[in-house]
Amino acid sequence: MRAIISLLLISTMVFGVIEAVSVEEGLKIFEGERGGCVGESQQCADWSGPYCCKGYYCTCRYFPKCICVNDNGK
């Protein structure tokens, strides 16, 4: 009985490690697919892209025309 429980626990841990590695690789692929970024006053969409470059953030004051604005060092 203990052997079966030990085997199940080990199998679960191995599966968990494999799954974690798969998710991490998937995130790396996703980051690579994001592509380039857009600069100030260019149209953006945080949820689907294009994304704002570093130093800018996407604001949707006039939805659906969201634009990148300078974060002024915030």
Swiss-Prot record:
Note: Negative results: does not affect mammalian sodium channels (Nav).
Pro-piece positions: 21-34
The protein's name: U3-agatoxin-Ao1g
Entry keyword set: Amidation, Disulfide bond, Ion channel impairing toxin, Knottin, Neurotoxin, Secreted, Signal, Toxin, Voltage-gated sodium channel impairing toxin
Function: Insecticidal neurotoxin that modulates the insect Nav channel (DmNaV1/tipE (para/tipE)) in a unique manner, with both the activation and inactivation processes being affected. The voltage dependence of activation is shifted toward more hyperpolarized potentials (analogous to site 4 toxins) and a non-inactivating persistent sodium current is induced (site 3-like action). Interestingly, both effects take place in a voltage-dependent manner, producing a bell-shaped curve between -80 and 0 mV.
InterPro entries cross-referenced by the UniProt entry: Beta/delta-agatoxin_fam
Disulphide bonds in the chain: C37-C53, C44-C58, C52-C68, C60-C66
An example molecular function term from Gene Ontology annotations: sodium channel regulator activity
Pfam family for this entry, one: Toxin_7
Swiss-Prot/TrEMBL domain comment: The presence of a 'disulfide through disulfide knot' structurally defines this protein as a knottin.
Keyword Amino-acid biosynthesis: no
